[in-house]
Amino acid sequence: MTFHFHIPLAFRDLLKSGGIGQYVVQEVLPVRHVDAQFAAFQTSFRTEAPLCILQHFDTLYSILHHFRSLDIAIKEDVLEVMVKVASRHANELPAILEDLNLSVPQRAAHLNALKMNCFILTQLIEAFEAETYKASLGSVEPSGKGKKAKSKPEGFSWESERESILQALTHLLQLDIRRLWSMSVVEEEFVSMMTSCCYKMMENPNIVMAKNKSTREALGHLLGVTVKRYNHMLSASVKVIQLLQHFEHLASVLVHTVSLWATEYGMKPVIGEIMREIGQKCSQDLSRESSGFKAFATFLTELAERIPAIMMPSISVLLDYLDGENYMMRNSVLTVMGEMVVRVLSGDQLEEAEKSSRDQFLDTLQEHLHDVNTYVRSCVIQIYNRIVQEKALPLSRFQSVVTLVVGRLFDKSVNVCKNAIQLLASFLANNPFTCKLSSVDLKVPLEKETKKLKEMREKYQGPKPVVVISPEEEWEAMLPEVLEAFKILQQESKEEEDIETEEIESSQHLREQILILLRKTSYKNSIRLTQKGIERFQEDPLFSEGDSEAKSELGILEKIFTEKKADLEQPTTKDQDDAQVNPTSEELPSQEVQNSDMDKQEMLVQYLSDAHHFALKIEEAIDVISKMMYETAVSVVQEVIEFFVTVSQFGVSQALLGVRRMLPLVWSKEPGVREAVLSAYRRLYLSSNGESERVKAQALVRSLSLLMVDSSAGILQCLEEIVSEFVQKGDIHPSVIQLLWEKFTQKSPCSEFERRAAVMLLGMMTRGQPEIVMSNLDTLVSVGLGEQVQKDYQLAREVCNCILKITDSQKQTLGKSTEPFRLPKDHSLFVCLTEAVAGGIGLSGLHWLPFKETAVRLVYELGEEPEEICSEILLRCSQNVLDGHQTQDEVPNVPAFLLTHLLSLAGDVALQQVVHLERAVSAELRRRRVLKEEQEAEKVGKQRKSKANESTMEEELGLVGASADDIEAELIRKICDTELLGGQQYLSAFLPLILRICNNPGRYSDPDLCTVATLALAKYMMISSDFCDTHLRLLFTLLEKSPLPSVRSNIMIALGDLSIRFPNLIEPWTPNLYARLRDPSREVRKTAGMVMTHLILKDMVKVKGQVSEMAVLLIESDQEISALARNFFNELSNKGNAVYNLLPDIISRLSDPDCGVEEEAFRTIMKQLLSYITKDKQTESLVEKMCHRFRTARTERQWRDLAHCLSLLPFSEKGLRKMQDCFDCYGDKLSDEAVYNSFLTTVAKMRRGAKPELKALIDEFEQKLSRCHNKGLENMDVPEEPSAESDAQPPKAKRPPLASVNVKKGKSEDDFQTPKPPASRKSRRKVAVNFSSDEESDLEAELSEAETPKNPTPIRRTARSRAK
């Protein structure tokens, strides 16, 4: 063998002549000779085995050269044979490699054969891969008419062959083939050839498909062998990075491959190399490839899920990305940290270094909870969610993380809020404290155990140990001061008084005196005494020592201080030792037991303290989350609902708040929200397991009753919808209904509230199953409305409501031709109701009024001839009121509360009579007419055969039906106008009294009586348009002048109903309705806001510029009113261009110096209103209108307001051009600093995200603004002489704040008159209606047609108008 096979860089390089002894392809066979030569190769393979390729390589090369032109059968045969050659070679090589007598030519032959075989196989792999990929691209193209889809060759599938080829190559590489090379070093080109085909296969997007899983496995193993045995690690690391940058689909594939290298092949360093390569990539490099960041982020994230422990040593190389601009890389690195915390750094057995790493990771995560990017904040919360669910978060961090997450509930991002709610729910579900988290319940044991811990400390530890300082240490501290005193003494004259020493009897006494002086820091005197001792007690060894005078005295002082002090301390120490040896009779536990008890108690207190603080934070979160219940984002609402289900299961004290707020969502138009509410209540109240039906029923009734405590009518209606839904679907067991009847009939002991709750629940269930009440109607009447009714009118009212549910269910089920369900007028129900209402009119309790209202409605809903029943009730009540109150002059003197009851009853009857006529009587007339027409049609029996005739008949019948409807409606209207309030009717008997009280509010001063009389008048006005027109001025006068907020609120509500019934009569008074929006009473403003919202959204009131009064409510300090105003504009914004059309007038009114609002308030209002302008055309139009408005602006305040409004609009290129076109309108106003700054804000907003060509236009506009601003400032520097006219002009009055406007009380009745029209309006003089308290005659305040206003009264927000 005289040649060696050199692996070429390119396929065609083998045709070129290389170095000496290098193999070169001699001839590329033509296609027609390929079959014959390939057959010869097969024959040679049977005899020469793998070495046959040495003679037939040119044939195989030719096949590859003509690969696209060859038939599929040849390709398949070549592939099959080459796989056999490689497998055969792999089987023979182990023995050859072990042969010590292998000659050099034989080794060279096997090496050449190995390289040739592998070269041909890798080239075949790449050729088949390219052909398959091209075919897959072609199969995606749509086939036109007449085109046949390309049929795949039968019997051959490249996808199924790939795995066997890769396994054959892997088998070869697993052998010790290094021995074939000289120096046992495999050439790099061979390794590159083997791996490049693998990377080529990975580039195919189809590699990620599930069917190619085995191929991915084979690729991973082949590359793993090269990384481990052939020094391919660094090259593989670089190649992985390149593949990730260019092929986004490979992230998951490479994660599997790389983790395989690290785990099964033990090549952990490759992970560090890849992470280092990623860490060294700069943002500029990655920005060129849009998919680069995403692929790297996905790769790191999924790799951390597989091998976080192996990645952990190299995490530092990625930390720079946390400060980078790309949020995906930040998310990826943070996710990697989270996985390491969960799977590597969790548990109690961590070392200090591991704890430190965990804390650093958690600190980093906490910092990025406030990341500037929404997606990062959301990702961090999700990471924490996983950490909490895996119980990997240290207890010491619970408080800080929960606090941060509660803060994220206020995030502007919907995803962040949603994930924050999920995390708080996970905190609850995985909390290590207790299953019942109530701060109130936890506070008591915490205080108890804290007190116990304090007592234990006092008992076991005793007084705090005193720090013991040795005499030598004390002397060292004193020495500088002693030396200073010695120097001072040497300088002083000896004329100072000598210390008397007569009393010193001995040297021992002298020592004690010196020690006392030293303790008192009297160093000079102690030195003098020492000098005296040296002179006097020479026989004492202490005073006779020392070389020099100074050293002698200092030495004596030191010895006296240290020795004497030590002697004095010894007895104390001895006493303490004796005390330890001889303890008191009360034996204390050993020190170990004491320490153990103390540790246990401290841990208990810490546990309770953490639990208490955690419960407080959760309750704080509940308050915030409950306000998110009505967000527009469905996903957030669903998470809130799920959160409150979790909270309720853990017994948090405020959970009921959220569960109640959840109820109105059952009316949501979003099916997902409604279903979430129903599912939540089903889980909360119907999912008890492992208990008897009786126990479940008791628990359900108890829970629902608790939910009804202090609930409003709206909440109860929502609960009724849910309960009826459960009943219809059979979710409520009959044992629950049985228990409710037992509670109502007092067979089961219960409180009064529980009894009422049982009746309410029975009524709710009746909507879903009417038989519940229908079959027990007699029981309801006898128990709830029987002899004991006067003891509990609340229960009686709920019984009436329960029976009314029959009618509600009947309305839903009965058809138009079915006779309505009604009871005879002598039924026991109406007998009991008559007795209950008449018997309670004389009682002064508060519960009779609502009972009476419900009873009257029940009579009209269920009774036949209800007007006769109610006339009997009114007669009985009138007699009861008059009985016992007659005087000698036969003029009754009736208490105010009796009149209140009587007039309230009369008003309810009047209103229900109208409702009865409009609904029940009208529907019955229509039903009878339709039934009669059907019967007549059956008698005639004529059938139309042609479709034309049938349609003609239907049209005729339709016209007849419409005409008949009009006739019936006219009949009902005539009855209301002429008969109901006629002189002989029972309702008219109460009218004089009602009008007298309303006309004389000074004489009838009882607030309740005035309120009820006004309401009764309004209800009477609902009957007849003539009566309404006659007394409308009286009603509006009371609305404006009455000092009672309850009267004004009730009138406002009544006028809302009157606007719907008689819109033409109320329309001229519309300004008076708007005026109540600035009423001094909070309740009246709230009521007016609700009424006007209803009327405007129902198109019952024309929306004019006066709607600015509603806009003012946006800045109300009362949260309910401001929320009502926000809701109004939210709904109005959904009605086409309503808000857009009103904005110019609203801006004009609110910025008016005479009747506008303060500047800050104006900005707050406009920020809300301009947020509804989202369409470009609307913005452009508003920009133009506001720019032109600058010309007519009178004050600088108006300039600022207009400029601020412009800064709030969302600008486009067209909007900018509009501003430039209108520059002359506002250019001269730019000298005002505030105006100029607002325009700069507008420019800055437009610059964000603008295209390059638009930025040039913005820069030009900004320069123009700057020039005008500077020019205006220069002109302002020139002083101007003030004109006389401007000096003489008085300041204009400004609108006082709402709080300063009060209704004057205590005035005479002359003040109660209809306000005069403005002076500028010329009209005929109108009669002013005066009310005098001295009047005795009945005034009906009837006005002529001329006195009724025909045009709206303009509203002026000036103090002057209020003073009139």
UniProtKB/Swiss-Prot annotation:
The modification Phosphothreonine is found at T1314, T1348, T1353. It holds the Pfam family Cnd1_N. GO terms for cellular component: condensed chromosome, centromeric region; condensin complex; cytosol; nucleus. GO terms for molecular function: histone binding. Residues 1333-1345 have a biased composition (Acidic residues). GO terms for biological process: cell division; meiotic chromosome condensation; mitotic chromosome condensation. This is Condensin complex subunit 1. Regulatory subunit of the condensin complex, a complex required for conversion of interphase chromatin into mitotic-like condense chromosomes. The condensin complex probably introduces positive supercoils into relaxed DNA in the presence of type I topoisomerases and converts nicked DNA into positive knotted forms in the presence of type II topoisomerases. May target the condensin complex to DNA via its C-terminal domain. Keywords: Cell cycle, Cell division, Chromosome, Cytoplasm, DNA condensation, Mitosis, Nucleus, Phosphoprotein, Repeat. Residues 1-588 are annotated as: Interaction with XCAP-E and XCAP-C. Its main location: nucleus. The keyword Cell cycle applies. The C-terminal domain interacts with histones H1 and H3, and may be responsible for condensin complex targeting to mitotic chromosomes. This domain is independent from the bipartite nuclear localization signal, although they are contained within the same region. Belongs to the CND1 (condensin subunit 1) family. Component of the condensin complex, which contains the XCAP-E/SMC2 and XCAP-C/SMC4 heterodimer, and three non SMC subunits that probably regulate the complex: XCAP-H/NCAPH, XCAP-D2/NCAPD2 and XCAP-G/NCAPG. Phosphorylated by CDK1. Its phosphorylation, as well as that of XCAP-H and XCAP-G subunits, activates the condensin complex and is required for chromosome condensation. A motif (Bipartite nuclear localization signal) lies at residues 1317-1326. Residues 567-596, 1273-1364 are annotated as: Disordered. Disulfide bonds: none annotated. Residues 567-577 have a biased composition (Basic and acidic residues). It is found in: Nucleus; Cytoplasm; Chromosome. Residues 579-596 have a biased composition (Polar residues).
